[in-house]
Amino acid sequence: MKPTFNPNNRKRKKVHGFRARMATKSGRRILAARRLKGRKALTV
């Protein structure tokens, strides 16, 4: 079986990055929730 985690920084940013989160309504909700919780890092 192939490993399930194949690190790829470009994909990582595209999927979980700040701009990707800001692009959708639900993504903005995620950021808001993480701000409320007081997360040190909002995104990867």
Curated annotation (Swiss-Prot):
The keyword Protease does not apply. One of its GO terms (biological process) is translation. InterPro entries: Ribosomal_bL34 (IPR000271). This is Large ribosomal subunit protein bL34. It comes from Exiguobacterium sibiricum (strain DSM 17290 / CCUG 55495 / CIP 109462 / JCM 13490 / 255-15). One of its GO terms (cellular component) is ribonucleoprotein complex. The keyword Ribosomal protein applies. The lineage of its organism: Bacteria, Bacillati, Bacillota, Bacilli, Bacillales. Keywords: Ribonucleoprotein, Ribosomal protein. Belongs to the bacterial ribosomal protein bL34 family. Pfam families: Ribosomal_L34 (PF00468). GO terms for molecular function: structural constituent of ribosome.
